[in-house]
Amino acid sequence: MIRISDSAQAHFAKLLANQEEGTQIRVFVINPGTPNAECGVSYCPPDAVEASDTALKFELLTAYVDELSAPYLDDAEIDFVTDQLGSQLTLKAPNAKMRKVSDDAPLMERVEYLLQSQINPQLAGHGGRVTLMEITEDGLAILQFGGGCNGCSMVDVTLKEGIEKQMLNEFPELKGVRDLTEHQRGEHSYY
């Protein structure tokens, strides 16, 4: 799941020596599986260990990972690098935001990945989001808008000129995109 280099283990062991006895480290992801995911490392005193945590035992320490973060920390690496400018702890977690789907994955998964990794981060600037509801047998992607996009007067332009063009360019097997949302204009609407 997580690889911690020898130099990082030595760095953590040095820090842990100044903490309450039995304190280890916790590796976690805030907002896992989203474009806003952030990884972190913190102290984990003995009374903060949960029964559902995964304990990863290393030579010099134990790293605890909570149940929600665990799948997003696959292939994560923690290293402690020293160069002429100083020392730096690095944490690389390539799956924290969302796992990249393979090119031969089912169309539904590939479309969902595009929505979550490229389209929704753009819509989030307006407080909006879009969800894939289904892909019909005749190749139509059925979407539902939420947040600031619901009731927005520009939603048709966003759908046709933005989302549909991008999706049809990326997935030639799609024939079009349709909006399933029952739009209700309100204070939540962006325009």
From Swiss-Prot:
GO terms for biological process: iron-sulfur cluster assembly; protein maturation. Involved in iron-sulfur cluster biogenesis. Binds a 4Fe-4S cluster, can transfer this cluster to apoproteins, and thereby intervenes in the maturation of Fe/S proteins. Could also act as a scaffold/chaperone for damaged Fe/S proteins. Keywords: 4Fe-4S, Iron, Iron-sulfur, Metal-binding. Homodimer. Disulfide bonds: none annotated. One of its GO terms (molecular function) is iron ion binding. [4Fe-4S] cluster binds at C149, C152. Its cofactor is [4Fe-4S] cluster. Pfam families: Fe-S_biosyn (PF01521), NifU (PF01106). InterPro entries: Fe/S_biogenesis_protein_NfuA (IPR017726), FeS_biogenesis (IPR000361), FSCA_dom_sf (IPR034904), HesB-like_dom_sf (IPR035903), NIF_FeS_clus_asmbl_NifU_C (IPR001075). Belongs to the NfuA family. Binds 1 [4Fe-4S] cluster per subunit. The cluster is presumably bound at the interface of two monomers. This is Fe/S biogenesis protein NfuA. SUPFAM superfamilies: Fe-S cluster assembly (FSCA) domain-like, HesB-like domain.
